[in-house]
Amino acid sequence: MSDVPEGIVEYAYDHISEWYLQWVESQNSPRERYARKLLEALPPSPSILELGCGPGVPILQLLLDQGARVVANDISRKQIEMAKARFPQAELVAGDMTALTFEPESFHGAISFYTLFHLPRSKLRDMLTKIHSWLKPNGVFVLNLAVVDEEEIHGEFFGYGMFWSSYDVDGNQALLREIGFDLLQVDVLQAGDGKLEEDDPDFGAEFMWVVARKKDSPTKRNVETMLGLGE
């Protein structure tokens, strides 16, 4: 097993694939609520990039059911294999998200839940900058981030070693704005909306949920209206 962060994360998600699927299918999470915010802000049949798709549920499934054309990535080949078995119509790409390449302005939207905090935070700016460049004008990015200001966190997840890295809320917001995102909505919520059992791996954790728009768009108000924001 590799001792670099990406290797730690890949190894863990390869080996917990069945447990992880059962967990995401049963866990209380705001993720579907925020995915719908993305869909509501985009045109019909949008092109969407999902980073950290896991086995394809629930987010990839929701996006496809709503008519989106999705390119989905996960670092774990096992997770991608599981997603392919369920959703062969999606374009699924295994590997490190930092190695992805797309033409500028390829996607109407992007979505990434429980994923970006597995990157060393020294790589987060470059990754967010790439996502910004891949979005079309008026593109919308919905994501969540951790809120603990720690360069390296090593722990266990379903019995396997795991790596996390994060800025705090102010640091996350500043970084997104510096890259060129307008932050339309920012919420800091307890994992599972505070309804998790004590034995849940996310019990007691907080996450920052963000709806962001590629900056300097003349239609910002239209996006905000569709999301029910700024009223």
Language-model features: locations:
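Conserved class I S-adenosyl-L-methionine
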Residues: 1-44, 149
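A short glycine-rich, Lys/Arg-flanked "PGG" loop and its adjoining helix->strand segment in the class I
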Residues: 125-137
